[in-house]
């Protein structure tokens, strides 16, 4: 029975994955194709501002697809037990700074601030933790209006390294909170860009943090907004301050 349950779960995962890919990846691919066709057939009749916007749209759609592929690869390898972890000791402030260099250019419309304690050394697979941070910040960008403030904090709390991504957006409805870390869950939202999600990012983040023997939780940010907080084990190496 246990073996049959695993097979059924894998079949359901495969079906959900195919459905999500066929439906949600079609939109950016059609956008790229349509914009490229416009440039090829009407380039001489388009002014520079219009061309620049088309180039920007193609770039943004391509970057989104790259992010989706990276998430797909990671989550399938994680589920199959094929994802190899390479744990090293890393400074939180350096990991946060490097992660911000990988955030979508759309963050220019947002105020992203960092507040990190110095010399907090954590044990992590740095590539995967950067993927977690990129996903959490992208999620904050997706569900908050331009001009919002997103704050990334790094601290040492209760014998663990802790990173939080806070936003001052509208927050997440109560009915979504219990499902927010489920794979393929995108919720019912009126956000214009909500179709641009396979519901993989937060599920992947949760799995990666669990593999680090940490926790990832969602809380409300006062007075409004969301606060995603995750913990990592502190390094056993001591830094001389």
Predicted regions and their residues:
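Short conserved segment of the HATPase_c
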Residues: 172-184
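Conserved catalytic submotifs in the C-terminal HATPase_c
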Residues: 86-91, 111-121
